[in-house]
Each structure stands twice: as C-alpha cells, then as structure tokens.
Amino acid sequence: MVSSEQMKNIEKKMFSMGMPVEALKEKVGIGISSWILDRQGLIENGAIVLVGPGHNGGDGLVVARELYMAGVDISIWCPFPLKKELTQKHFDYAIRIGIETLEHKPDSNSNSLWIEALFGLGQSRIISDEIVHLLNTKKKSSPDKLISIDVPAGLDSDNGNTVSNISSKASSTLCLGLFKTCLLYTSPSPRDA
C-alpha cells in the first residue's frame, strides 16, 4: 500500500532511471484491456471510456485503443479539455483509427461498460454535480458496469475521503503499480446530485 506521494516518488525514480512515460502508459493500457477482455460479459454491449484531462485519461485512451483493436464496440467521452501532451497524442490517434467520440454525455442507463479514467492518483479537483449524478446513475442502473482506473473519481487517494463528499463508487478499481492507501477504507457513500 502506498500514498500518492510514495507512488509519485516511485514513478519519478523509474523515470529518472530511463523508463519512458510512454512505455509505462502502454503497459498499463494493455494490462487493463487484457483484464477486461478476459471478462467478455462486461463488454458484450460495448464500452465507453470517460477520458480525463491528464495522465489517467491517457491510460484510458490506450485501453480504448486496445479494446477497439480487439473488436470491441468502443466510444470515448471527454468532459474536460485535455491538458497533457501525451494524452492529446493518444486522443488524436484514437480519432484517426476510427474510435467514436461522443459529443454529449453518454446514456447512464445503457448496459455498456463504462471505464472511468477521469482523474486518478492525487486528485484534488472538485467534480461537478453533473458528472457525479451521471456516474451514480450508471452505478445504480448497471452495478457491475463501472470500472475505475487506479482511483475512483472523487476519492482522495491518501485517506479514503471523498473530494467534496462525492465519489463514483466504481464496481471495480484497477490499481496501477501498487495498491493505494484509500482502498483500506470503507467504500465512500457518494452524494447524488
């Protein structure tokens, strides 16, 4: 178990030893997509990746690409402007190869798998009521069809508290690298907006 600061220090050491960020992102995306592909029932109605502005969003875009290449009906939705150059490159490539980009928020009552890649480790951003409501509605309508990458949106990765008393409360969280301290705590109760 590691805190966000410990995980960031581990990553800094890896990068200082020559590990390319791009290679790590590929490893993460391939691992997550393999986990999902091993559970075909999750993707029988397709999947939507909710892409955040930073590196977590980039991880989600690699997952989207790998699932698309495996023949999964996949779409991406970006509710925020992308802020990281590498994430933008993965987004541009996803568009070039034909992955559908949703212009409007996805239907939370659909039976498609949602892969939440909005914020991840060290999140401090307050999530809008609209996003919270969307994630909570998805969790209620399809309890097993909401997966978070690394740390669920709205959850403080160090103490398990919710950022502004909200959290996506994913059915599964696929941790990257090492388990995060927040997972020791009881699952948070999200506020439904």
Task: Go through each PLM region and give its residues.
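Conserved beta-alpha-beta core of the PfkB/ribokinase-like small-molecule kinase fold
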Residues: 147-163
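Short, glycine-/small-residue-rich phosphate/pyrophosphate-handling segment
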Residues: 158-184
